[in-house]
Amino acid sequence: MTEALLKYFRTKEQEVKSEKRYDSQCPYCSMQCKMQLIEQSIVSRKKYITIGKDNPTSEGRLCVKGMNAHQHAFHKERLKYPLVKINGEFVRVSWKEALNHIKENFMKIQEESGQNALAVYGSASITNEEAYLLGKFARVALKTKYIDYNGRLCMSAAASAANQTFGLDRGFTNSLAEIPYTRCIILAGTNIAECQPTIMPYFERAKENGAYIIAIDPRETATTKLADLHLKPRPGTDAVLANGLLKVMIEENYVDEKFIQERVNGFEEVREYVLSLSMKEIEEITGVPIQLIRKAAVRFGSEESGMIFTARGVEQHTNGSKTVRNFLNILVSTGKIGKPNCGYGAITGQGNGQGAREHGQKADQLPGYRSIENDEHRNYVAGIWGIDPDDLPRKGVSAYEMMEKIHEGEIKGLFLMCSNPIVSNPNAHFVKEAMKKLTFFVAVDLFVSETARLADVILPASSYLEDEGTMTNVEGRVTLREASLPCPGEAKHDWQIICDLARVLGKEEYFSFSSAEEIFTELRMASRGGTADYFGITYERLRKEGGLLWPCPETNHIGTKRLFETSFAHPDGKAAMVVVPNIAEIPKEQLCEEFPLYLTTGRVMSHYLTGVQTRKSPALAARNIEPFMEIHPATAAKFQIQDQSLVKIESRRGSVMVRSKWSETIRHDTIFVPFHWADSQNINLLVSKELDPECKMPGFKVSAVKVSPVVDFLT
């Protein structure tokens, strides 16, 4: 026994002596938790442990994804060398060969079909520096108007609503630190317990302090279990529910008349409209009983402080922007904004969902959240870039609309960075066919994803452990992620790939950067004076202070913890309310005899986005090895579906097969399927192509479907 103990302690001593520690930041959700990877070398093997590091946002917490993130970074299928497709097979080539091949094909396409025959498709998982550089690359190196990114499918509705209501879009109007002290919270369409687990303690502390929590979700989730009141609206009726809440608040005088008079436009029009509505009709449309609507409205309206949080559940609709605006109508009409423990939070999905939409990846945007159609904004950014403003392209189209442009033959070449559009987009078969139609397609990725399989060239990118640069997290806090390890093989930093490609295209003078910090220095200048002003933020400050909330206009500025304390960002300083009709401009799919159920989609805790990274992590993949269909047992019985049996789900656009999972807590008319899988299990094959007319968000959360047991289908 003594000998065994000695052997154990000597082994542990050896592990400690061989330890290397790498500080990093999680590559997944918008919390951007700080972490430390511990590498222990034991003889010829290496073992890794990840621990959380204290920081202002996650306070040292990690979830299961963060603890296992390193597994995909060290996966044997990581891309380490450039690949070119020859006779249908990928062949390893040198960087010089790959870049020259891209140059020849890009130049040929533009010579034959014009500058806008090339398009760029970006990502909200890359750093601010890379997002900024990608927007500049599209407009300066390629001179194309066609650039958009996968954040269009994630945050566009909330961003549009905040910009229109407040004049500025920062994920949170106040810091996370205020959540525990608010008196009432509305969680609309957000499952933070599974999607952003490390944010949950803020809400748990609020509950401990006596806050009343109202959850709005057609499903019962780990998040709704925290709530004092759970409203289960029919999928797609959240805007109508918000009208009901607002009607009660106005009728029972829970609005802040002084705040409205001094700081709000449009209230009278909204008041007139909602007072004309019938609560009985609202109940019939939403499926939420009048007494529960009234209970929620009275509680939120009567409390001295309150916050509203939205996420994809209310945003991923063809009226997602207007739906969020209606929840913001509630917020501003009750005066719960710009004050202590009051405000709005858009629970950003992707790691850099906030920063990636601020600095030029969006079709209509320039750095600093400037508009590409505004001449003053164009002149300023062109001056920073050293080009003629007339050479800047005008606005392009959204991510999904670029797929339509490919089908129409206008776009013939694509540069794709760190995204998987044939899995993440709606009407996925149409998107896959678009990618196949491209004359030339370049993908930058960690792995040969489902989309990258179709590429002519794949360039190996850097993972979070090798990458360097800033990320802007869920509350609008800019943080610095230092590089921990060198890139494996011949893989390069994403920003280096962009600079190398610009060089072979003859644009080196605009992309002569030698570090991410140099890029950030230019980004600071380009954002200066914009609504998303990063000028006062430096790498030195981020290292010392652990992160800064923008806007931060000067290097001696402490950052902005709470927005709109005295004024909103519109020219007149007022917030803008707007009437949100019960009937949406773009009709949503309605149930019928052939398609009698609503399909809604979402995440599970162990996976992220299209699963390209998490499906390469054994510890995460094992938790959910396949998608599932959550269905109420009574509904399952109606369609002869057994628990844990294979089921065919079919919409007007296609079908998939998944395994059933009975749930007593989901609505009888609704099924839920997570979206992290591809090919025959890609649930987005079933989703409509219709887009929100304001922000171009697809309607992922409402599709009319039918279900049947696979055994019947096969026979």
Positions of PLM-derived features:
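Long, contiguous, secondary-structure-rich segments that constitute the structural scaffold
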Residues: 488-490, 494-545, 594, 610, ...
